[in-house]
């Protein structure tokens, strides 16, 4: 993430949730079901933002599970922490650039929700996360609450056209060409979901 992007996310953090009309409960529940997230799982939520996934993750993994939420934006993390005050399990929060810094721990699932186009080195980052942070049999879930064309239109409106999101099929082909085992779990108007690993 560039300094310009970080500044943008810090500025828009207070109004982010009111702008996000796509992250509906039924879509997030479907994401977690298709992604295989279950009770007692350990979750690494990369680019947690304002923590939109956290209540759903906590309900899904329960008290025997664990959640680590990572974001570089202090503004976003402040809101995520406020959202998580009563959650069980209580998430552990890390403010760091996960592309530049190694992360501790091993996880059943690593989730990148609305994150992939912001990665500067996606293949390198996914390889490292899979090698260093993903439990055997686990998945890295790349997800969006709508189709790629709509995400690209949003990025065009806010003048970040270089943040292009390929279709799930295109992304899967690209990742496989770089020796990352990827498969499409959902590709429709309500959910974009690609799994890496497993």
Language-model features: locations:
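Conserved beta-strand signature within the Rossmann-like core of class I S-adenosyl-L-methionine
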Residues: 137-145
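A short SAM/SAH-binding and catalytic strip from SAM-dependent methyltransferases
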Residues: 109-122
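Acceptor-substrate binding/catalytic loop of class I
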Residues: 154-169
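Conserved class I S-adenosyl-L-methionine
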Residues: 1-36, 56, 79, 148-150, ...
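A short acidic, Gly/Pro-enriched loop at the edge of an enzyme's catalytic core
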Residues: 99-110
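A short glycine-rich, Lys/Arg-flanked "PGG" loop and its adjoining helix->strand segment in the class I
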Residues: 124-136
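Class I SAM-dependent methyltransferase SAM/SAH-binding core
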Residues: 44, 50-100
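Core SAM-dependent methyltransferase catalytic element
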Residues: 180, 186-198
